[in-house]
Regions:
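N-terminal glycine-/serine-/threonine-rich phosphate-binding loop
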Residues: 2-71, 145
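Ligand-binding beta-strand-loop-alpha-helix segment within the catalytic cores
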Residues: 19-35, 95-167
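Short glycine-rich or small-residue beta-strand-to-loop segments that form or flank ligand, phosphate
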Residues: 70-74, 103
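Glycine-rich beta-strand-to-loop/alpha-helix junction loops that act as flexible
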Residues: 73-78, 170-172
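Active-site catalytic pocket residues across diverse enzymes, especially alpha/beta-hydrolases
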Residues: 86-93
């Protein structure tokens, strides 16, 4: 089975006007029937930059009001470009993650090694920004089966306690 096929999609046969409208009218014509707003970019890098820019804007808005920005993150390869751009913004544009709370969306179960989703996110993202480790919540892939239901209920309560999720980044894979 081939993987990472989404990075090989090219838009050479699709006229630009179908994915990059020139004005608000064209945009409304293209999106009026969408139930979920969708943007199409020519490359994964372009899409990653746009998503990271949107996340950074929302983080900064919450910082201005002294509030916490809550996001849920996946593992895998899909978000790596977004993480790379957020790290760049942290290093070059002083984007701070001190007011950010993260909920890791899932974890392997049973976790039989230290190479779970949380470990990968830590290596690929958390270790490169100034997020407080106490603000990172992750499912525990090593708990007993009897404890899973209670843990999941507590995880939901933790999400509610911080006001819900502001931004959820999902993987495609």
């Amino acid at each position: 089975m081939k993987t990472n096929l989404s990075s090989q999609i090219t838009l050479m046969r699709i006229p630009t006007r179908y994915y990059r409208p020139e004005n608000a009218f064209e945009h409304s014509v293209l999106t009026r029937l969408e139930k979920v707003p969708t943007s199409i970019y020519e490359s994964m890098d372009d899409g990653s930059f746009a998503v990271a820019k949107e996340i950074a804007t929302q983080i900064r808005k919450k910082q201005e009001t002294g509030k916490t920005f809550v996001m849920a993150l996946p593992g895998g390869r899909t978000p790596l470009g977004v993480f790379k751009e957020l790290i760049r913004m942290h290093e070059e544009e002083q984007l701070s993650f001190r007011n950010v709370v993260v909920f890791v969306e899932y974890e392997f179960y049973p976790l039989d090694s230290a190479s779970g989703i949380y470990s990968r996110l830590k290596e690929e993202f958390f270790d490169h920004v100034d997020i407080d480790p106490a603000n990172i919540y992750s499912p525990d892939g090593s708990m007993s089966k009897d404890a899973i239901l209670d843990f999941c209920q507590q995880y939901e309560q933790n999400i509610q306690a911080v006001g819900g999720i502001d931004y959820m980044l999902l993987g495609i894979g």
